[in-house]
């Protein structure tokens, strides 16, 4: 519910100071409540805030961030987060992966999971996806009607085709399609491949990724190229970037550029930067723009494929002042971190390993930028970094990478207090 609203609710769970209730009917509506743009919103679990005015969505997320820092991190004295308003609230996602299922009478369902369920909501258009992805999805739907392939997303059953992943180049218009199955189905996919090549979706590659294991990982270790190539190109911070089919790359390119440029601005205003350490460097989207500014950069990435693509991306852009190390950050960082380094941390949602935080507070690099996609783990990690009073938070910047959802990206800049 939004401020000022009145509603009829059903109490589902109650404690002394807490009640969890389900909404039955809104009696008095807030002017901040809007009509969802998506016709599937009431069922689909992909978005959770389409009923809220977009700018107020960001205000809610900012409050959740502040609450996490105060309640989880037990932080009392930190600067007010700066809000960077997103450039677009819809059609921003450059990648999506859809579970697939054949109904008993042969119809193929492609979509997203229903809220709090493993049932697939059949969608034909998603307003947060890049238009090119929606176009490719529409083409795939039509082709699958005439070319039946056994499909079942449920890892407990035999399956066949499990997921369809579509990635688009926002600035290059390239499209890459990956069919994920629990065994090779490339022979079954060839008729589909031929028709997709003849469509207007600008497809540069069609792949079959094989994921035979009964777990929740979408992609497996083996990918077969059916046609074209297994990557796309895009422009990122004026650099040419190669992105693999299973590579991690921020789904909102425009907002990711804003975050990188914010880090560049912080670095440009500091003195005597000897080198930059980019922990969790991925395919080099942070390291390469920073190296192009003339800094010496070391990128650390444990994923083999991402590491190899990062090297290729540096070569494509003729960057000579960068070194990529295919290493575990927790084991490798203690060997190279120096007090005058500028350390950039961009970990997965689970945050930093406690042993890595111990290394940081022991070796004490003078500057730290921590980019986080999870306010809860960010708050936890900051409390551990700050507990010995060796660092001060200089700035907190919030980016809305994921409009229409509760997710938030946060950049925290810390500076060492002691020499």
Curated annotation (Swiss-Prot):
Residues reported in the UniProt entry to bind [4Fe-4S] cluster: 38, 44, 47, 126
E.C. number: 2.1.1.-
InterPro entries noted in UniProt: MeTrfase_TrmA_AS (IPR030390), MeTrfase_TrmA_CS (IPR030391), NA-bd_OB-fold (IPR012340), SAM-dependent_MTases_sf (IPR029063), U5_MeTrfase_fam (IPR010280)
Gene Ontology molecular function, alphabetical: 4 iron, 4 sulfur cluster binding; metal ion binding; rRNA (uridine-C5-)-methyltransferase activity
PROSITE patterns on file: SAM_MT_RNA_M5U (PS51687), TRMA_1 (PS01230), TRMA_2 (PS01231)
Location of the active site: 373
Name this polypeptide is given: Uncharacterized RNA methyltransferase Pro_0965
Native species: Prochlorococcus marinus (strain SARG / CCMP1375 / SS120)
Lineage, broadest ranks: Bacteria, Bacillati, Cyanobacteriota, Cyanophyceae, Synechococcales
